[in-house]
Each structure stands twice: as structure tokens, then as C-alpha cells.
């Protein structure tokens, strides 16, 4: 297994649309394992393949404290089950150190495939619903900062660019 490099906002590669997975092979399983290792090391609770510059529809997630609930979503789609919105404070491994409130539907249904290509459905609410929507957005080139005002987005971008210059 390997720790993968996580792209950071405003890297334009984060805006790339992910392509559907068509081959469920050892290379895909290795990517999934590497993504989990990268996510746990960061540390985070979700990671989309787009964030590690692999533009395939793959998401890994684990909301547990002890890494006991790893979830894999391949070729996912999400459907709102309610128009009721909730506000959660979101952060992102691609936007390190920044947390902002984002409004999202409180309940969703996910259709996806597991690491072996087997289809499944899952109804989600609360933090799981938020995380699913956040990570699936990545597959469509969207970041949580896109839900913020232009002013907040620009401020975050400038701070991250300054950090990158200082690290260089």
C-alpha cells in the first residue's frame, strides 16, 4: 500500500470529471487500498479518487473512530429523499485547515457498486448523508467551497496559495 499525494485547492485537476469504472481488477483494488491508507493517514473520513489525481468514480469513506466501518462507492449516484436541508460544518483534505457551514439535503439514497462490482443501495442521513454528497461532488469537479460566497472562496484560495509559496 502507498500514501498518495492529495491535490489541494485551487489545483485545476480537482475540477476534472471522473469517468465510470469499467474494470474491477487488481489495479482498482490496489487504488482503493491506497486511498484508504491515504485517508487514514491524513487523517480524514472520506476521499474521492479525483483528490489523488485519479479521475475514476471511486470514493472511500470511514466515519468510525476506530477505522471499523470502511465503505467503498464505485460509480455512485445520489438521490434526495427529502427537501429538508441541514447545515453541517464541512472540511476537506483538498482544502486543509478550513471549515465552513454548507446546506445539504438531510436524507439521500445512494446507488453504487462495491469493490467487486456488485451493485448496492444505501439510505443515508446525518453525517453519512453529508459525507456522501461531499465526496460525490468531487467526482463531478465540485468542492465544498463552491457552496460559499465568492468572497469566502477567494479568501481561502489566497490563504492556501500563500501557504504553498511559504512551503516552496
From Swiss-Prot:
Cofactor: binding comment: Binds 1 Fe(2+) ion.
Cofactor(s), names only, from the UniProt record: Fe(2+)
Function: Removes the formyl group from the N-terminal Met of newly synthesized proteins. Requires at least a dipeptide for an efficient rate of reaction. N-terminal L-methionine is a prerequisite for activity but the enzyme has broad specificity at other positions.
Taxonomic superkingdom: Bacteria
Keyword terms: Hydrolase, Iron, Metal-binding, Protein biosynthesis
SUPFAM superfamilies given in the database record: Peptide deformylase
EC number: 3.5.1.88
Family: Belongs to the polypeptide deformylase family.
Underlying gene: def1
Keyword hit for Cytoplasm: no
The protein, known as: Peptide deformylase 1
Active site as annotated: 135
MF terms in GO: metal ion binding; peptide deformylase activity
Binding site residues for Fe cation: 92, 134, 138
Organism: Pseudomonas putida (strain ATCC 47054 / DSM 6125 / CFBP 8728 / NCIMB 11950 / KT2440)
Xref: CDD domains: Pep_deformylase
Substrates-to-products reaction catalysed: N-terminal N-formyl-L-methionyl-[peptide] + H2O = N-terminal L-methionyl-[peptide] + formate
One Gene Ontology term from the biological process aspect of the record: co-translational protein modification
Amino acid at each position: 500500500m502507498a500514501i498518495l499525494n492529495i491535490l489541494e485547492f485551487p489545483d485545476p485537476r480537482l475540477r476534472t470529471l471522473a469517468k465510470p469504472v469499467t474494470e474491477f481488477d487488481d489495479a482498482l483494488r490496489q487504488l482503493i487500498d491506497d486511498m484508504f491508507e491515504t485517508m487514514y493517514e491524513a487523517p480524514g473520513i472520506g476521499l474521492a479518487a479525483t483528490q489523488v489525481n485519479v479521475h475514476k468514480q471511486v470514493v472511500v469513506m470511514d466515519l468510525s473512530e476506530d477505522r471499523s466501518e470502511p465503505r467503498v462507492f464505485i460509480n455512485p449516484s445520489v438521490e434526495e429523499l427529502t427537501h429538508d436541508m441541514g447545515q453541517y460544518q464541512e472540511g476537506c483534505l483538498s482544502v486543509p485547515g478550513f471549515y465552513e457551514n454548507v446546506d445539504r439535503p438531510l436524507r439521500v439514497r445512494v446507488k453504487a457498486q462495491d469493490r467487486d462490482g456488485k451493485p448496492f443501495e444505501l439510505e443515508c442521513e446525518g453525517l453519512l448523508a453529508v459525507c456522501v454528497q461531499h465526496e460525490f461532488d468531487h467526482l463531478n469537479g465540485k468542492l465544498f467551497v463552491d457552496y460559499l460566497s465568492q468572497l469566502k472562496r477567494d479568501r481561502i484560495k489566497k490563504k492556501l496559495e500563500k501557504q504553498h509559496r511559504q512551503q516552496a
